[in-house]
Amino acid sequence: MVKRMHCNINLKYGVIMKKDCYTLRISLKPGFINAEQLKAIAYVIENFGDNKAHITTRQGIEFKISPEHLEEVEKILNNVGLNLGSTGNRVRQVVSCIGLECYNAIGDSVSLARRIHEEFEGVWVPRKVKINVSGCPNSCTFHRFCDIGICYRYKITINKEICTNCGKCKDFCDLNAIDWERKIIKDNCTGEGKCTGLCNAFKAERVISIFVGGKGGRIYKEGKHLIDLKNEDDVLFVIDELISLYAKFGKGRMADFVENYGIENLRNNIKELIK
């Protein structure tokens, strides 16, 4: 695995220097925060800050304090399992949807996101790397618009031998991804899997899709599909390889690396390693 860069009080990591204060950013583990941690944050911002905190777009929390309270505040946060982070040229806090708490979930996105977070958050990279995990194709975490996006979905196929030509599926898909006459699923299928309830001819295989090279911002890009995997261990393996290649050859953002390296070259390299 990629070597972790251990950081504690580092004004470039989790601490943003302002003119008359520090802004501290907490790197939260994906999914949920407990009551004890919320109480600690409330205590800190009430006693050392300006009595308010900001919820970041990556599900983190940040707030202002006076510089002289940095060590004391960090100790209070550490005592309840909270750490500063998610700034600078590092792998940032991993974002997840609510996973199995949602009735649309195809996979446990929270558990996978936490594994990724624990393994890679804080690792040095040429530019910041954002990783988002969605439990289904609804894309609540906008996994196609971040450096590495992960999505649980279904690969749908039609068994032509079982199909009775009943026509139930002909106009069922709002994406028109079912070719009823040829009995195939088109490439624009998102893998939601609702069509599998129509009849036994539809078969669904759960996969974990990885997208790479997306980003938000003023000049946004949609990530490109890299590979479909069958288990979470392989997901961590692929992320490790992506970050290693990016750390070695990357200069701009991950999107620039993918463009320069070539998505087909990247796909071929990853597929060879997964065999």
From Swiss-Prot:
Give the superkingdom in one word: Archaea
State the InterPro entries in the record: 4Fe4S_Fe-S-bd, NiRdtase/SiRdtase_haem-b_fer, Nit/Sulf_reduc_fer-like_dom_sf, NO2/SO3_Rdtase_4Fe4S_dom, NO2/SO3_Rdtase_4Fe4S_prot, NO2/SO3_Rdtase_4Fe4S_sf, NO2/SO3_Rdtase_FeS/sirohaem_BS
Q: Molecular function (GO) terms listed?
A: 4 iron, 4 sulfur cluster binding; heme binding; metal ion binding; oxidoreductase activity
Annotated siroheme binding lies at: 140
Q: Does the keyword DNA-binding apply?
A: no
Q: Which Pfam families match?
A: NIR_SIR (PF01077), NIR_SIR_ferr (PF03460)
- Residues reported in the UniProt entry to bind [4Fe-4S] cluster: 97, 102, 136, 140
Q: Which family does it belong to?
A: Belongs to the nitrite and sulfite reductase 4Fe-4S domain family.
Question: Could you tell me what this protein is called?
Answer: Uncharacterized protein MJ0551
